[in-house]
From Swiss-Prot:
SUPFAM superfamilies tied to this protein: YbjQ-like (SSF117782)
Family (UniProt): Belongs to the UPF0145 family.
Native species: Lacticaseibacillus paracasei (strain ATCC 334 / BCRC 17002 / CCUG 31169 / CIP 107868 / KCTC 3260 / NRRL B-441)
UniProt name for this protein: UPF0145 protein LSEI_0651
């Protein structure tokens, strides 16, 4: 099950030896609807957090991690080390998020 894939931002996992399988990533691109964009535009005028976009980014990160786990499992990995995020905007209302790292297989 992909949920059992350990994901860490560190290079080493205490007490574990492993062999490197290779790079894996999970990618998602999300957008908000027109009504959310109007609300964000109004919030931009008065200042403050744009909750709809914060929620979208949180959801995007969770989806990217889920896909990263799936890719690591397909590659035969037990864990992903050195996990990182990257994100970028596509147009005015779309956000792309990638989670990437190195899939590894534990040695017995």
């Amino acid at each position: 099950m992909a949920q059992e894939i350990l994901i860490t931002t560190t290079e080493n996992i205490p007490g574990k030896k492993y062999e490197v399988i290779g790079e894996v990533f999970g990618l998602t691109t999300q957008s908000k609807n027109v009504i959310s964009n109007i609300g964000a535009g109004l919030k931009n005028i008065v200042g403050g957090e744009i909750k709809a976009y914060s929620d979208m980014l949180h959801e995007s990160r969770e989806k990217a991690i889920e896909r990263l786990r799936d890719e690591a499992q397909k590659a035969g990995g037990d864990a992903v080390v050195m996990m990182r995020f990257d994100s970028g905007s596509i147009g005015g209302d779309m956000q792309s998020v990638v989670a990437y790292g190195t899939a590894v297989k534990f040695l017995n």
